[in-house]
Amino acid sequence: MPLYENKELSDNDLFRSVVLYGRNVASYKFALAKSLLEIDTTSSEIEIANLAVPFAKNICDHLIKNEKQVTSKTSKFLEACKRFNNAEINEEELKQTTIRMGFVNVIDAFHIVAREETTRFFTDNRSSNNSIILTDNFYKLKEKDIYGNLKNEAESRWNLWETAISLNVNPLLLQIINDDDQECLYVLDEKKKRQNITSSR
């Protein structure tokens, strides 16, 4: 049964499934989820040009903490983000690069979980106006008290994912340890060195 036909799952559950269980060969799905939860969504039509900078800066922030943001060896888009962090290109150049390269696959792949399509939180309108259009399902998320938690959950999952691929470990197999005193979660790398991944609060 496709996820969107499962009546027991709420829109919140389905959005979480995208973030938690969606197939990821790069961190773009996390960046897109966070950006959609952060930007002004008064208008349901979001132009890629307006989404580009928040999306790219989320990735730039994570590159500072962990350079491993893709399972492949290289990415021209990630190289541009690194150049921005190193002040080698400006924000406008980062924006234009993101418009060209940043959304090539993530828009199509966002709603795929376990090779099935889940409920759509936006539709692809790039062929008509280089934009996406938020659906009623997205706006239903904003009606819930836990809407603010979704961004934190996306961040936590992103931290876990990037830690796992930097250690060459399947994220599902990563052993996570809870530090009650410091209220954080961490893992041990191959040298038994501690790596904090997220708050446990």
Functional labels for PLM-detected ranges:
Residues 1-200:
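Mixed-charge, low-complexity interaction segments
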